[in-house]
Design a protein with these regions (language model features):
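Structured catalytic-domain cores with a bias toward divalent-metal coordination
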Residues: 1-272
């Protein structure tokens, strides 16, 4: 067994206070990938927090190569504030982020706004040392859990195909500056490999979605040779190159998209 070590990324905020963001580090003692799993970049997206806690227990029992770095509360002030961003007040919509959408601030700035400082602290303490990343979210515009990944023949595509999530939404690589980007783009643009999973919806923790997040993290660890055993797959998977189509074509109780939507069976072979 490999015992988890609790550590903290320390962010110095603009008012002079400090935030200690907790993360677990589990090292197998053998060479291998350094796998980062994080959740709650937005403070009301908490399903991934429980998935990470359970994945920690799996890794403590079964990790045979490499190391994992588990961040259950990436945006700890927003989690405490019960808002998507630390800048939001009551009834303010998600879009009023004013530069505080954490997943648009990577790799962060040492002397930026408070959210940029949180990202900077996590990047320095965890992300820049890791080779693979799973970013767990809970966007309520998805009514079924879905993977977001790059369809580029690279690591992101490979990871998406083995995660064990029924729906995959393919996205093109971003264009333009890397100054203030998603953590997924930060990893993928540097050749390290990342996917995002939306464990819908927000505000709640549900057994089904937590189980899906745990399965995805475990499958990825198996893909990377960090945990033994067969990858647990589902059949079929459905994919789409569109955006914002999940609302009208999928539900948590359906086994296939609704008639007329843009989701199609994914026919490409999976990596194992």
């Amino acid at each position: 067994m490999s015992e988890a070590t609790l550590d903290h990324a320390v962010a110095a905020l603009t008012d002079g206070s400090k935030v200690r963001i907790p993360f677990w580090h589990i090292d197998s003692g053998r060479p291998g990938e350094k796998f980062m799993v994080l959740a709650a970049q937005h403070g009301n997206e908490v399903q991934g927090c429980e998935a990470i806690r359970r994945f920690k227990e799996v890794c403590e029992r079964e990790l045979v190569a490499g190391s994992v770095h588990l961040v259950p509360f990436a945006n700890l002030p927003a989690v405490r504030h019960r808002r998507s961003h630390i800048s939001l007040g009551p009834e303010q919509p998600y879009g009023d982020d004013e530069g505080h959408n954490m997943n648009r601030t990577w790799p962060g700035k040492a002397h930026g706004n408070d959210t940029e400082r949180l990202s900077y602290a996590l990047n320095e303490a965890v992300a820049r040392h890791c080779t693979r990343c799973l970013d767990l979210h809970s966007w309520s515009r998805f009514t079924a859990t879905a993977t977001l990944a790059r369809l580029d023949g690279g690591l992101s595509e490979q990871m998406a195909r083995v995660a064990g999530i029924r729906f995959i939404q393919w996205r093109k690589p971003p264009t333009g500056s890397n100054d203030g980007t998603t953590i997924g783009a930060l990893f993928n643009d540097s050749g390290r490999g990342s996917i995002t999973i939306e464990l819908a919806p927000q505000w709640v923790i549900r057994e089904n979605e937590v189980s899906l997040g745990l399965r995805a993290a475990t499958n990825l660890a198996k893909l990377f040779g960090m945990i033994g055993g067969e990858i647990e797959q589902i059949d079929p998977t459905w994919s789409s190159a569109g955006r914002m189509t999940m609302r009208r074509c999928a539900s948590t109780n359906s086994r296939r998209p609704a008639r007329g939507c843009s989701w199609r069976p994914d026919s490409r072979p999976r990596s194992t």
